[in-house]
UniProtKB/Swiss-Prot annotation:
It is found in: Cytoplasm. Homotetramer. GO terms for cellular component: 6-phosphofructokinase complex. Pathway: Carbohydrate degradation; glycolysis; D-glyceraldehyde 3-phosphate and glycerone phosphate from D-glucose: step 3/4. Catalyzes the phosphorylation of D-fructose 6-phosphate to fructose 1,6-bisphosphate by ATP, the first committing step of glycolysis. This is ATP-dependent 6-phosphofructokinase.
């Protein structure tokens, strides 16, 4: 393989730049030319492709976001979009692609491989909700950023004796809420993977204050449950009488310089993706399990260890959907000093 390309797709995540850098530098060391594709699959279809060299990536390791930029491009799910993208790849003599992103990005990588262009997926998302890996690129940084913000909210909550509902990202998974909640000493953590009773939430807040055990109260809420304002309103409807505030950390969690762990993880995965493409291997996703790199087929059966399967009507389904660690939810309950 003489020429490969790299793109970032879906939501940005700290560490994506580190992965791109690793792909470029590893490929150059193997005598392979590298091209960057701007704005993910949209840029592929539109031919927004350019040559990358060591100088272009020399100062991106510590930068958040993705210097290749990203975009959601549902049109690539259709055959017409795929063929247009492949036509552009052929113009540049590109023979393989590294795709950094989430589940939707993996689906695109799978389609490219089916059309004869080996593609390797790297898990890039702050939500940590991609199957086939223990941790995703960007998760560690997102947790660190959320924890820092929650520490500051703890300060003001204590100063005024207030209750805070703090919303963090996590549309389908509660990993950020659980990890940042435990790290910041949250009193309650509400995640999509676990049912909750709003009356119990309010009872714990009330009894914490009345017993004198609590002078303030922090509830960390994953966005996949509902928004902080709506949750706070439900608390009031259920009889909460505390001085209640709602806040949303929002996109702040996505930004910022990646942690050392995210940089190392992204670099390790990016270099390995080049090794796979050099061998002509595509249709796989790289992950980490028990601190070792692993590879999983993107499409196949659950028995084969594949991440996704196709139903008889052609619908893509996840074989083993990601679930946040609910033992961490139990851990937090044991530490919150609430009955």
């Amino acid at each position: 393989m003489k020429r490969i390309a790299v793109l970032t797709s879906g939501g940005d995540a700290p560490g994506m730049n580190a992965a791109v850098r690793a792909v470029v530098l590893k490929a150059i060391s193997e005598g392979i030319e590298v091209f960057g594709i701007n704005r993910g699959y949209a840029g592929m279809v539109e031919g927004d492709i350019f040559k990358l060299d060591a100088k272009r990536v020399e100062n991106i390791l510590s930068r958040g976001g993705t210097f290749l930029q990203s975009a959601r491009y549902p049109e690539f799910a259709q055959l017409e979009g795929q063929l247009k993208g492949i036509e552009q790849l052929k113009k540049y003599g590109i023979e393989g692609v590294v795709v950094i992103g989430g589940d939707g990005s993996y689906h695109g990588a799978m389609r490219l491989t089916e059309h004869g262009f080996p593609a390797v997926g790297l898990p890039g998302t702050i939500d940590n909700d991609i199957v086939g890996t223990d941790y995703t690129i960007g998760f560690d940084t997102a947790v660190a950023t959320a924890t820092e913000a929650l520490d500051k909210i703890q300060d003001t909550a204590f100063s005024h004796g207030r209750t805070f509902v703090v919303e963090v990202m996590g549309r389908n998974a509660g990993d950020i809420a659980l990890w940042a909640g435990i790290a910041s000493g949250a009193d309650q953590i509400i995640v999509p993977e676990e049912e909750y009773d709003i009356n119990e939430v309010v009872r714990k807040v009330k009894e914490g204050y009345e017993s004198g055990e609590k002078s303030h109260h922090i509830i960390v809420l994953a966005e996949g449950v509902m928004g902080a304002e709506e949750f706070a309103a439900k608390m009031k409807e259920a009889g909460d009488t505390s001085d209640l505030r709602a806040t949303n950390l929002g996109h702040v969690i996505r930004g910022g310089s990646p942690t050392a762990r995210d940089r190392v993880l992204a670099s390790w995965m990016g270099a390995h993706a080049v090794d796979l493409l050099k061998e002509g291997i595509g249709g796989v996703a790289v992950g980490i399990h028990n601190e070792q790199l692993v590879e999983s087929p993107i499409l196949g059966t659950a028995e084969e260890g594949a991440l996704f399967s196709l139903t008889e009507d052609g619908k893509i389904i996840v074989n083993n959907p990601h679930k946040a660690r609910l033992d961490f939810a139990e851990l937090n309950r044991s530490l919150a000093n609430l009955k």
